[in-house]
């Protein structure tokens, strides 16, 4: 089993001088803000891969989850995808989706998403002929109600 000191730093590289180091905006912030390295224009209903020009080495016990920033979500901007595997070493890109009605401009240095480190578990998978039954069964997609 891999043992890692919880205080071990996560190494990252600025691939260009346009890259900005990930930052936490408060001591209690769950995520590190990621910054756009370039200018982009995203029309309504479209999506764009935003480059950060940052690459990093994830701890073996974690993966990186790219999550939306609440201020951008309020403007109709969402995240597509959002998993950085622990063995990925390339430029971290963020897929922004413009669900709003207006064109959205991303400027160099804008905070575009947050990176949250989450522990990961790699279970052994076992194929079986059937699963144990539960009261819920195969009912999903809102079947438990709103309240």
Swiss-Prot record:
Biological-process GO terms, alphabetical: dUMP biosynthetic process; dUTP catabolic process
SUPFAM superfamilies: dUTPase-like
Catalytic activity line of the entry: dUTP + H2O = dUMP + diphosphate + H(+)
Chain residues that bind Mg(2+): 24
MF terms (GO), sorted A to Z: dUTP diphosphatase activity; magnesium ion binding
Enzyme class: hydrolase
EC identifiers of the protein: 3.6.1.23
Superkingdom of the organism of origin: Viruses
Coiled coil: none
Disulfide bridge positions per record: none
Keyword Magnesium in annotation: yes
Record keywords: Early protein, Hydrolase, Magnesium, Metal-binding, Nucleotide metabolism
Family, similarity comment: Belongs to the dUTPase family.
Name of the protein: Deoxyuridine 5'-triphosphate nucleotidohydrolase
Originating organism: Vaccinia virus (strain Copenhagen) (VACV)
Gene: OPG046
């Amino acid at each position: 089993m891999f043992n890692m000191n919880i205080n071990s730093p996560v190494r990252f590289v600025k691939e260009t001088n346009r890259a900005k180091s990930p930052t936490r905006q408060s001591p209690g912030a769950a995520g590190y803000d990621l910054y756009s390295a370039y200018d982009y224009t995203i029309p309504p209903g479209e999506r764009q891969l935003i480059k950060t020009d940052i690459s990093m080495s994830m701890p073996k016990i974690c993966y990186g989850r790219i999550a939306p920033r609440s201020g951008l979500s309020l403007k109709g901007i969402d995240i597509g995808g959002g998993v950085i595997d622990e063995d990925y070493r390339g430029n971290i890109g963020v897929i922004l989706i413009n669900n709003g009605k207006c064109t959205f401009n991303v400027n160099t240095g804008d905070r575009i998403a947050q990176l949250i480190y989450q522990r990961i578990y790699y279970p052994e998978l076992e194929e079986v002929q059937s699963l144990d039954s539960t009261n819920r069964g195969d009912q999903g997609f809102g079947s438990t109600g709103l309240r």
